[in-house]
């Protein structure tokens, strides 16, 4: 499957040109933003780690080996890109133990920048945001047009698609999920099960969002929508009054789409009709998610791009800096600007 089939239409028209991303690790930098005051004592050793060309799971395995502990005692908030320069937190549970010598874990691809103790382990999804610095090289596009589109995006946000990274190479993860769903089976390995269930939910969400981008309603509240704030997992129904809430205009409040699980869509009106129609069209995937014990959740349809800035270090380089909530994809912003020329591996998760 191609990008259009896995995601959906762009919000702001055709790509404005072409560029390369991830020609080097420095072209895709991610800094995890953690809003947790660390106590300095406790049985959990917290590590601020810089990784280059190394995914989060391999870094965790390396830290576990160096510390002489089982992998399950190593925790992290989110998955970060392999083909990138990333900085993120890990924690290791060490009850009654001194800080281990972790030098064996470090080399050119992994450096421990600082460490401290805390009373609790690092939970998945505990980070507040991810900060990105992207360098688009070999840029072939009109900079005036790029600037105009970036200004619009800064004001209006972008569709909050799950990026192609979620679906694997050419959508292979989705094919696997469909196969398991058809057999009414679940993968035995926990990591594979989690990956494929996430793929199925993400695809159903993207189909709903694609339909609303196509009809222009992705950034507008309509009666029957379920609304949520940018950083909140809770939601509430939209009536006539809620559809004119001023917080919609300033990108604090957004319509949401389904993360399918048990039950029908809790939305109403045209929103529920669309969501249930897509779920019925993909009934095997939806029923598979229900049998797996997934609960119905919501995800904002519109993604505000926090602290977006850009400049051109050279005539053929565009550098972007911005902040996204956890679970949102930097490559979806790039997609609203340009087409990417193939450079290295790009199909790996950028955020959890």
UniProtKB/Swiss-Prot annotation:
UniProt xrefs under CDD domains: PseudoU_synth_EcTruD
A molecular function (GO) term: RNA binding
Keyword Isomerase in record: yes
Annotated family: Belongs to the pseudouridine synthase TruD family.
Alphabetically ordered keywords of this record: Isomerase, tRNA processing
PROSITE patterns (alphabetical): TRUD (PS50984), UPF0024 (PS01268)
Job of this protein: Responsible for synthesis of pseudouridine from uracil-13 in transfer RNAs.
Classification via Gene3D superfamilies: TruD, catalytic domain, TruD, insertion domain
Top-rank lineage group of the source organism: Bacteria
Residues at the active site: 81
Entry keyword annotation includes Isomerase: yes
Organism: Pseudomonas savastanoi pv. phaseolicola (strain 1448A / Race 6) (Pseudomonas syringae pv. phaseolicola (strain 1448A / Race 6))
Name used for this protein in its record: tRNA pseudouridine synthase D
Domain TRUD: 157-303
Top-level enzyme category: isomerase
Reaction it catalyzes: uridine(13) in tRNA = pseudouridine(13) in tRNA
GO terms of biological process kind: tRNA pseudouridine synthesis
Protein EC: 5.4.99.27
């Amino acid at each position: 499957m191609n990008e259009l089939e896995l995601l959906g239409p762009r919000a702001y028209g055709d790509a404005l040109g072409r560029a390369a991303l991830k020609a080097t690790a420095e072209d895709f930098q991610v800094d995890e933003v953690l809003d947790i005051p660390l106590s300095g004592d406790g049985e959990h050793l917290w590590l601020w780690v810089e990784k280059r060309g190394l995914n989060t799971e391999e870094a965790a395995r390396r830290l576990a080996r160096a510390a002489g502990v089982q992998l399950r005692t190593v925790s992290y908030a989110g998955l970060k890109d392999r083909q990138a320069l990333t900085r993120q937190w890990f924690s290791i549970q060490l009850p009654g133990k001194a800080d281990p010598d972790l030098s064996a874990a470090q080399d050119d691809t992994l450096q421990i920048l600082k460490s401290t103790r805390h009373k609790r382990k690092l939970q998945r999804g505990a980070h507040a945001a991810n900060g990105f610095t992207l360098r688009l090289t070999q840029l072939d596009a009109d900079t005036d047009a790029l600037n105009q589109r970036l200004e619009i995006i800064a004001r209006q946000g972008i569709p909050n698609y799950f990026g192609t990274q979620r679906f694997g190479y050419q959508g292979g993860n989705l094919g696997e999920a469909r196969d398991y769903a058809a057999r009414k089976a679940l993968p035995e390995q926990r990591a594979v099960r989690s990956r494929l269930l996430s793929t199925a939910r993400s695809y159903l969400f993207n189909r709903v969002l694609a339909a609303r981008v196509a009809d222009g309603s992705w950034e507008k509240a309509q009666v029957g929508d379920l609304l949520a704030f940018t950083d909140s997992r809770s939601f509430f129904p939209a009536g006539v009054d809620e559809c004119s809430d001023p917080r919609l205009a300033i990108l604090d409040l957004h319509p949401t789409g389904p993360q399918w699980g048990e039950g029908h869509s809790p939305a109403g009106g045209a929103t529920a009709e669309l969501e249930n129609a897509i779920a019925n069209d993909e009934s095997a995937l939806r029923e598979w998610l229900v049998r797996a014990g997934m609960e119905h959740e919501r995800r904002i349809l519109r993604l505000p791009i926090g602290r977006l800035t850009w400049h051109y270090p050279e005539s053929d380089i565009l550098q972007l800096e911005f902040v996204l909530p956890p679970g949102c994809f930097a490559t979806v912003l790039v997609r609203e600007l340009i087409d990417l020329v193939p450079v290295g591996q790009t199909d790996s998760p950028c955020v959890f």
